């Protein structure tokens, strides 16, 4: 799952698509309208393919081959042996090579699809109050924040309200650091409004207790850090008590880097021009081993790929392991933009499969024909699921161009994107359930070949 621009103000259950991508939500809906023909064709194809009962019982010999313990070995390799693998790093390439080797070993035609993306990393963040040196501040640089000058900067702090243009007309902001509340606007808009008013940096604090993190989506003109609700209130109190200056030192890397989508293709014997995509993102956030987010999804996809290696399928099945999902769904955006002729009939997205009791079959705003088929198949297999609306993962880019999707997702993991996302928390039994359902969906949608 991606980092939110502002989780508090998301209008859907998880991270808002317009908050983690470069396109606003209205552009997404416009794209969906533009691609209506693509959607209708894909839905009609799926309707024909899925009209008959799946006959899950007839697939039981294949489903019985699924092994959660075997899938768990991939989690160990990716999250424990390799560890955190942020897009654009050497560990990222190591994880890509591991996945490519697994696919090649099982007979898939493997492609490395390279693309560039805006890489961001934090080297150092320090916030101090020279007049109160004993206070400890846990500031976090927001994604795509630029650096301060070497050695940092010291300036007075002024309140900037919610960061709206009118909030900066009530006090002298030029040359100061703006203290801004979370809410109402996207973080990037708050930062740009502060910069336009003359602020040299911005501090955005949570309006609820606890820390927060977020993304500016793209670089802005001034350094931006976040504070917890408690620390934000403390700093605001110092400002109101007579004014305060702070020293802020932010050192980040903002540059274009290269990563890859790893693609494994198994051609269909009856209708090879129709393609079912099975996707899972393979990158992590910094400092997170990524056992559940998303080594678990990669492991489930690799397990399904291994089972299918000797099976003749009617349509082509393509396993795509996306890069730079955590940076803003860049890998799936690139893949969809270069997919070409509209041959994709559906997409199964696997993200966070190893922790939590609830399993969702989800879409975002597009057709739910594949999600409903997945729910039917799950019922035949005796797997409890709920149909939901979820965004914040790679299926959204497929829905953007009208491809029916189903997102298999376990939402109840409070430790994802943290250093505590470790292999001991991933349950092999849950991997087996997700892999069995994903395999049944693939077999039901692609059909058996000659």
Predicted regions and their residues:
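His/Asp/Glu-rich mid-to-C-terminal helical/loop segments that flank catalytic regions of hydrolases
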Residues: 414-450
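Bacterial N-terminal signal peptides
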Residues: 41-51
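Extracellular/luminal Protease-associated
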Residues: 89, 137-229, 381-384
